[in-house]
A protein has these predicted regions:
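Short alpha-helical segments that sit at the start of domains
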Residues: 1-12
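Short capping segments at the starts of secondary-structure elements
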Residues: 18-23
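A short acidic, leucine-rich amphipathic alpha-helix
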Residues: 26-30
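A short, conserved structural fragment
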Residues: 46-56
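Basic, amphipathic "hinge/linker" alpha-helix immediately C-terminal to the N-terminal HTH DNA-binding motif
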Residues: 57-75
Length: 85
């Protein structure tokens, strides 16, 4: 499997959280990131205010913030302009 750039993984996390908040296990699965490494990606996003931790039903979940949503939308705009395919 080809190694993905960290930027792509960060954006995949935002894309998944755009759909709905997720716990770390489901988030790691959805983004195809090893559970042991997911925190390495979540921490910088949280420190920059792009995601937040919440408690939901006694479980820790992550949700996208307004800033994270804006960044994700900007990224989609750039991505759509690239000559891919």
């Amino acid at each position: 499997m080809k190694k993905r750039e960290p930027t792509v993984i960060f954006m995949e996390i935002l894309a998944v959280l755009f759909e709905s908040p997720r716990g770390p296990t489901r988030l790691a699965q959805a983004c195809n990131v090893n559970y042991g490494r997911i925190e390495n990606f979540l921490r910088p996003l949280e420190e920059r205010g792009l995601i937040r931790r919440e408690a939901a039903g006694g479980q820790e979940v992550f949700a996208i913030t307004d800033s994270g949503y804006r960044l994700y939308q900007d990224w989609l705009g750039v991505w759509s302009r690239l000559p891919l395919g």
